[in-house]
Amino acid sequence: LMVSTWASATSSKRISPCRPRQFLLRAACAVCCLVNVLAAQADEVYLEPTAFVSQAFDGQPPQAGKLWVAPELNARVKDILGNALPLRQKYWRQGERTVWILEAIGRDKPITAGYVVEQAAITRTAILIYRESRGAEVRHPFFTDQFKGATLKRDGALDRHIDGITGATLSVHAISALARVALLLDEAARAKPP
């Protein structure tokens, strides 16, 4: 009787060949869930694009317009961003003020930013949606206020130096590039009748 009890006890401790597979499957599921949770947390909506447009026009936004992006303009945009814009770019215009909602890749994911341009100078910059896992400091006024009054020089560069943020270098470059694009698009929009 003792021998059979000992045999059953030792045999129950044996690991079946299915158990390592179950463990690996459960571990893989846990990792996938964690990645999804982290990815969901990385999408930070700081301000809805429609709210930004409304604020830019004191709650009375005009109808959205479309700017046909000419091949020469798109070539300049591609030099700045590394990719071209769609053939029609949505924007809002009232008098000399234009509003642009633009996206660029920071490190791995798109950053959505809004720019208000008036008389060929940026009057407001806001980070609307930030999807990166790092570098979200670019959303704060201490960074975005650097763009107030920025214009384009003849060579297409901003007329001022934009201070970087440690750990957010690629996001800083993306936001600066989008500022240049917003000014280029504003220039093209002002060249056509309202």
Regions found by a protein language model. Name each.
Residues Q41-H173, A177-P194:
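Flexible, solvent-exposed loop/hinge segments and secondary-structure transition points
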Residues R26-N36:
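Bacterial N-terminal signal peptides
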Residues R14, L34-V37, D186-A189:
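Hydrophobic alpha-helical elements and their junctions with loops/disorder across both membrane
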Residues K13-A28:
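Bacterial N-terminal signal peptides that target proteins for export
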